[in-house]
Amino acid sequence: VIEIGATKLDSKFNIIDQYGSIIKPRVYRRLQSAIRELLNYDESLLRTGRPFDVVFREFKKWCGEEEYIFCTWGPLDLTYLQQNMDFYYMKEFPFPLKFYNLQEIYAINHLKDKSQMPSLEKAVRDMNIPIDAAFHCAKNDAYYTALVFQKMNKRKLDDMYSIDYYHYPSCEEEEIASHHNNYCEYITRAFTNKKQAMEDKNVSNLYCYKCNRKLNKKIKWFVNNTNTQICVGKCWSHGLNCGKVRFKSTKDGNVFVIKTVTKITKKEFEHIKDRQDELRLKRQIKRNQKKSVS
C-alpha cells in the first residue's frame, strides 16, 4: 500500500469528508515501470510519505467511532490493507468484515452480468460523471467511487454486501452462514486438506438457498478445476440449486471453504451436466493412454 484515500458519506449518501495520504514504502522502495506509468507520481513523492502504521492510525481515527461499512471498487483493496496491518502487527478489523463491492454491484445492476468487472473509469464515463481529476490516485478514485455509488440504485443494497475472506473462521463456532435473496454463502474453518473438507457434512450437504431444506443431488459433487467443485440439487418449492465449493489456501498450508448455493435455470443445469460429461471423458481418455503406455 503506497497511498490511502477515502471519501466519507452520511446515511443519505451525501459526501461529507475526504481523506488522502501518501505512504513511504518500507519493503519495495522502487516502483515497477508499468505501475509508475499508471500512477500520477513516482518514487520521489513516495519518499515524502509517512510510515503505514502512522497513516493507518490516522485513517482509522478519521473513520470515527460510529458504525460504518467500507465500499470498494473490487475486492482486493481490503486484502492489501490487511496484509500491511499484519506486517505492522496492528489490531484486526472486527470479524466477519462486511463490505460493499461496488464494482460487482455495478456489474449486476447496470450490466446485468456479474462476470463483467468494469474499470472505475468506464463506470464513471458510462454514468456521465464529470471527470475533473486524474484516475489511479487513491483519493481521487475514492471520490469517483462515491459519485458512482450516489447514482446507483440502492433499493436492494442491504442484501448486496460481501464478506471479506482475508481472515477466515478459526473454529466451527465462528463459521459464517450468510443468506441473501438469490443465494446463500457458507464460510468454514480451516481443514487439513480438500478431502477432509469435503467429508464435513456442512460442506458436502446441499441445502436450498431459500428455505434451507436439505436437497437430493441430481448431479453429485465433481471437480470442475483445481480449486472448485460443483453439484446440483432440486428443491420442490424453489427449483434447481447449484452448489459451488471454492478452496482457499491458508498461510500454514491448510484450506478453508467458501460454499455458495444459487438458483439456476434448466439451461444452466444442462450446461453443468455437459461440463461434467466433458471432464469425465477427458479422465477416461487419460486413463486409457496410461494403460496403453504401460
Role assignments for model-derived ranges:
Residues D42-S44, E104, K122-R125:
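N-terminal globular core domains of eukaryotic regulatory proteins
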Residues Y41-T48, K91-F93, P130-A133:
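Short, polar/flexible loop-turn hinges at active-site or ligand-entry regions and domain interfaces
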Residues I69-L76, Y80-N84, P118-N182:
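Acidic, Mg2+-coordinating catalytic module of metal-dependent nucleases/exonucleases
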Residues K151-S294:
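Acidic two-metal-ion nuclease catalytic site recognized across multiple nuclease folds
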Residues V1-T79, G243-I285:
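Conserved non-catalytic scaffold segment of RNase H-like nuclease domains
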Residues Y100-S115:
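Short alpha-helix plus adjacent loop in nuclease-associated cores
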Residues T79-L97:
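Substrate-recognition/cap helix-loop segment adjacent to the acidic, metal-dependent catalytic center
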